[in-house]
């Protein structure tokens, strides 16, 4: 026998260069960092989602050491107006709750406000976004669960909320214009009868658990064992859960490589619960499990070739399947945005992956890295043996229950490792992410790859219209944004990377394709409409609009959004619908955000109009709710915090009305010399950019001004009949009354002025023959393009020559002229710019804030602190900042009183700004604040009962 050393292998080279061994091994392509660990995680346990993007816009991810959860979000940077990912904020309550156990899985609920965190021992803790995206409070502690390896979570799903939302099926081009197909989408159960949160989990030992909240916001739990055919089936590795019309569909994969399917029903006793009628000790709803159709199972195999297309189909070499392991299991539902309802049966999708490194002894290394196996869930007749026909039946016409079957569909092969399968864009797109960072969009029905060139006249999703993710090796964990315009990836070193979808917008090869450009705008519009209808955060869409679209394309998008939702901008008659219109603030918000440049630069004129209308709407709704919540006899008819907010908004509303009048008086003086030349008047008007003039001409903003006057009149009259007040409430209400009493114009005189403007606008429409069908056009021109349409030029002439002069005798013009309106932030003068640089105004309370240290450069802040003889911690003031408009709120805690909490919750301002953007707590600047150990935005305690009771209904 020859010695091993006789084959020419030098022992000195054994640990040297591999090429010197001359073993004939081909060099292997280096795999991404952490891929082997990622594949092992996916093989061993079904719940290993390390990063998740909620529908409210919060991105939560597990740190590299597996002991912490950090959160980030998209935000507009105040200094330069650029949209970026925020700095990370660690959630210390998660680390404390799990006591050093490795965190393995994250999952947001459907509204995107509550987060479930699971560790390696199957313990689950639950948290909720309280007042800001980076302020998350604990609801359920992980200590409630035992420390048991058999309790590891292999599948998890939140119960849906019971609410009907508006949705959109598609956009189709009809006669050169896009037509959008809206419909009302009903929710899919099961639901919690109290509309509280519920979380369904499947454990490794085959136990299904339901964690649910009682009406008092405390968590309870029930559990049951899934029916199995053998002991080995109880050791589960993966489970997929999804809500269907027939109950919860559960697919499990066991250690013996068997896939089973279950239908789980959750029955509540009692089925309904009304807190207004139930009196203690009436029982709260208690759930129980019922299992149906538990016999569907399939022995999994990965064929060497596509068995449905003949031998060696698609040119694939044959390979063995003994080394393929399941690394992913999902259930794909038909598209939810379907006006006819979801009629198709769901699909079960499994990922089978080959080992990352194989030896020469196994020829299967020539096979694909991943095989995606799909089964269609079908219902078929239950066939019996013919001998059963001879058995007499005791029941005539006995109906045989249908049988559920799993029908194998064509497999999908890939030479890359599939690391994630996500159903996005409301079920219209299946996104598969591979180990090299590439993302491929598929049609869930056919598994055909979207290429963006199939049909330029029909748009069902962004992917179908040609949006795609360029190749980028950025990570092994991925989560898509609420509207799939962006994705965030987590790499092997625990770093996050933001990725945006891209589109050519018709610019290809130096030419312009109008069809592709139009389809891209329609796809963005469709995504925005779906987000508005489902009450989903749309910052990812705004990010695409700001970064990728020209101002002309942005204007096209805004016009499409107003037409698609649809929004009739004419409110000369139906003004009451304006207060509760769900889409108007959404459109105004994104319109205002597109014109934001930075904190110190004025907005564009076109975006300043919707920004002002948003402020008018806030004051109008505030006054309406103030009177609503103070009706009838109550122990505390007026809350000091509410009155302080009413006081600030009253001062703002009055100053805004004075600012409008002051501007109109100046315009009347400028146009006085042109009273006899209508042509010159019209030409000068075209070159005039006056925000107050547009606000008065627009029926929407004019209606809000009338609502504000009605509210101010009611507050003024109610002071005399108000219940006896004490303390701060008396001081605030007295100041409100005194502010109205000393105003340079009476409320009734201002209402008379608005009536004169309304009359001038109506006469202009009537004179031009514009009826209700023609008026939305010029009204939209005012609101969207900030231009005075030709039909309203006579109205402007009447206002400046007749309405404004008639008001002079009823006002104190000197006081209005000398007023300081810089704090409104609406002018472009030097005084307003200086105020904007030095002070902030609470956007909710309309009260000037103290200069915040975090908003100043650190050197200047420290210098100011030294000059005042105070430490930095004494001058620092924590605040919330809107991630969209960059305005601030001084409230960093939930409202203290019930009335104040109900008011803020009804206004929708617990987590969101007046503009609709989400709040974020500003980070700490000084080391003295950081040395305390708790970062800014940390809610270390449990959510108070008052807060927990109202969070579910706010957004």
UniProtKB/Swiss-Prot annotation:
Keywords: Activator, Nucleus, Transcription, Transcription regulation
The organism's place on the tree of life at top rank: Eukaryota
Single GO cellular component term: mediator complex
InterPro entries: Mediator_Med16, Mediator_Med16_C, Mediator_Med16_N, WD40_repeat_dom_sf
Places the protein is found: Nucleus
Keyword Transcription included in the entry's annotation: yes
Biological process (GO), any one: positive regulation of DNA-templated transcription
Keyword Transcription: yes
Subunit structure: Component of the Mediator complex.
Family: Belongs to the Mediator complex subunit 16 family.
Task performed by this protein: Component of the Mediator complex, a coactivator involved in the regulated transcription of nearly all RNA polymerase II-dependent genes. Mediator functions as a bridge to convey information from gene-specific regulatory proteins to the basal RNA polymerase II transcription machinery. Mediator is recruited to promoters by direct interactions with regulatory proteins and serves as a scaffold for the assembly of a functional preinitiation complex with RNA polymerase II and the general transcription factors.
Protein name from the UniProt record: Mediator of RNA polymerase II transcription subunit 16
Species of provenance: Neosartorya fischeri (strain ATCC 1020 / DSM 3700 / CBS 544.65 / FGSC A1164 / JCM 1740 / NRRL 181 / WB 181) (Aspergillus fischerianus)
Gene that encodes the chain: sin4
